[in-house]
Amino acid sequence: MMNDFELSLKSLGVSFTSKSIDKLRFYIEKVLLFGTRFNLVSNNDRNFDAVLLHVLDSVAGLPIIKDKNPRQVLDVGSGAGFPGIVLALFDNFRKYILLERSNKKATFLRMISLELGLDNIEVLERDVDKEQNKYEFITIRAFRDIREYARILKLILKDGGLIVAYKGKLNKIKFEVSHIESLFNKIEIKSSTMNDGKERNFLLLYK
């Protein structure tokens, strides 16, 4: 499956080396090793290929980040490092700030960042509604309804800033967007097509 993953990276225009792929393997192995202790992934995802799919979902957002070219990115609710660790691994041109409220998961994020030698990562251990700083670019893997967190994220978004929410099926996104249109200056939906055939969409919220 790693060969398919490398083909997906190429289709996205994401540069990689044998060293970055080795680091990725190491990262996935650590997620599996500490998965139970730190509650990193669900029971159904505790195998290499399942975690690799999370990695693929994460890296799919990198072309948007490179296109917008922010100085730094705040990743809200990083969990096991999807997408924050993965993005930082394949993009050392900017700083990634990983916001995670769980002590166990924040501890894992700090540990794996050091072991991978990712000096472009900072981990903040707190809830998003306790965050006081404002950011130009925010990512979130948004399994829940966007209405649950759109207002909170807008409060920590700089004027002219952008929130990129990793989402799934298009019809569900359109329903959610209809309830938050008045909150943002502009809303876009971008899709990502890769060779695994999975539907991946991104919700772009401009302040």
Swiss-Prot record:
Record keywords: Cytoplasm, Methyltransferase, rRNA processing, S-adenosyl-L-methionine, Transferase
UniProt lineage: Bacteria, Pseudomonadati, Spirochaetota, Spirochaetia, Spirochaetales
Family note: Belongs to the methyltransferase superfamily. RNA methyltransferase RsmG family.
Coiled coil: none
Binding site for S-adenosyl-L-methionine: 77, 82, 100-102, 141
Cited SUPFAM superfamilies: S-adenosyl-L-methionine-dependent methyltransferases
EC number(s) reported in the record: 2.1.1.-
Localisation: Cytoplasm
Native species: Borrelia turicatae (strain 91E135)
Keyword Nucleotide-binding: no
Record protein name field: Ribosomal RNA small subunit methyltransferase G
Keyword Cytoplasm: yes
